Curated annotation (Swiss-Prot):
This is Elongation factor Tu. It comes from Acholeplasma laidlawii (strain PG-8A). Its EC number is 3.6.5.3. GTP hydrolase that promotes the GTP-dependent binding of aminoacyl-tRNA to the A-site of ribosomes during protein biosynthesis. The gene is tuf. Gene3D superfamilies: P-loop containing nucleotide triphosphate hydrolases, Translation factors. GO terms for molecular function: GTP binding; GTPase activity; translation elongation factor activity.
């Protein structure tokens, strides 16, 4: 049978491996590519290719991450694997690699460890919707009861962080065994990918979500009106659509009377397009950078929220000293800086460079916010921390 030509007709899903250091995340990533390559669905990547992760920058923070891609019969996957623990923390908080789901790797020989817990917590905080568990190194555990005990421990830990611990698929296997081509362990990696296929939901395509566009610039066209420019974050906007202008000032409703891209007029624009939207009855002062245009009723302005933040270390160009409650930096959301006040959680005296922490933030004026919205914290124009909105609080 001729090999099928690669077509982008399959739904695309972003996943990643998470878990404690040395529990086998990278070996499993290599094993997945190796097993799927045997079916003509991936290019085999060996451990060293994945482990030598290149540096990338996201929101002014350097992160090491390896990206591999592969397919199952049903889907096309992009898979991210990070070499160091700090890279995971940064990756998840900055959203450098959005994950629609993750494979939690736990060594059956060691059971859950501190970073296992931390990665589950981070997944919960930054909104990774679904986890699948791979109990690795099962070939090193002779006692079946011990394996069951570790599985129970992992399930309890997941439930502790509000994941459905009883329902999450747990596959016991050996990544190294699969990489070496041993049939019983190859079968376990196949079982894992079946679970990932079935349990991790296909994300809504960006174009199927309600329209939103952060405003980057505003200008006036004489005789025609005010144009707001920016990149459509999600959804579709058509000429004649009503939109709301949200954030900074009171929410206003207007109608899009024209959509322009590369100086050409369009009937509609969709997620990813850089456009200018002509707004009816809005003067030059009626819309500004930092606001968003959105489908009416879908986005609300908020000023107060809890957030998970990662504070850059001195070596990363961050602060040299700790900060305390009532710290007042600038919060950079989408296109604009806005001052806010940080309050630390009970029992936390201070936050040191290199830490990650949960904090409460109150902005000086409300802006369009949702759970999962990413932001940077800046001081004098340089990034000192990165964060993700965990929960909106009543103002």
């Amino acid at each position: 049978m001729a090999k099928q030509k690669f077509e982008r007709t399959k739904p695309h899903v972003n996943v990643g491996t998470i878990g404690h250091v040395d529990h086998g995340k990278t070996t499993l990533t290599a094993a997945i590519t190796s097993v799927l390559a045997g079916k003509g669905l991936a290019t085999k990547r060996d451990y060293n290719q994945i482990d030598g992760a290149p540096e990338e920058k996201a929101r002014g923070i350097t992160i090491n991450a390896s990206h591999v891609e592969y397919e199952t019969v049903n889907r096309h996957y992009a898979h991210v694997d990070c070499p160091g623990h700090a890279d995971y923390v940064k990756n998840m908080i900055t959203g450098a690699a959005q994950m629609d789901g993750a494979i939690l790797v736990v060594s059956a020989a060691d059971g859950p460890m501190p970073q296992t817990r931390e990665h589950i917590l981070l997944s919960r905080q930054v909104g990774v919707p679904k986890l699948v568990v791979f109990l690795n190194k099962a070939d090193l555990v002779d006692d079946e009861e011990l394996l069951d005990l570790v599985e129970m421990e992992v399930r309890e830990l997941l439930s502790e962080y509000d994941f459905p611990g009883d329902d999450i698929p747990v596959i016991k296997g050996s990544a190294l065994g699969a990489l070496e081509g041993k049939p019983e362990w190859v079968a376990k990696v196949e079982e894992l990918m079946d679970a990932v296929d079935a349990y991790i939901d296909t994300p809504l395509r960006a174009t199927d979500k309600p329209f939103m566009m952060p405003v980057e610039d505003v200008f006036t066209i004489t005789g025609r009106g005010t144009v707001a420019t920016g990149r459509v974050d999600r959804g579709i906007v058509k000429v004649g659509d009503q939109v709301e202008i949200v954030g900074i000032t009171d929410t206003k409703t207007t109608t899009v009377t024209g959509v322009e891209m590369f100086r050409k007029l369009l009937d509609q624009a969709e997620a990813g397009d850089n456009i200018g939207a002509l707004l009816r009855g809005v003067d030059r002062e009626g819309v500004e950078r930092g606001q968003v245009l959105s489908k009416p009723g879908t986005v609300k302005p908020h000023a107060k929220f809890t957030a998970q933040i990662y504070v850059l270390s001195k070596e990363e160009g961050g602060r040299h000293t700790a900060f305390f409650s009532n710290y007042r930096p600038q919060f950079y959301f989408r296109t604009t800086d806005i001052t806010g006040i940080i309050t630390l959680g009970e029992g936390t005296e201070m936050v040191m460079p290199g830490d990650n922490a949960e904090v409460t933030v109150e902005l000086i004026h409300p802006i369009a916010l949702e759970e999962g919205t990413k932001f940077s914290i800046r001081e004098g124009g340089r990034t000192v921390a990165s964060g993700s909105v965990v929960k909106i609080l009543a103002d």
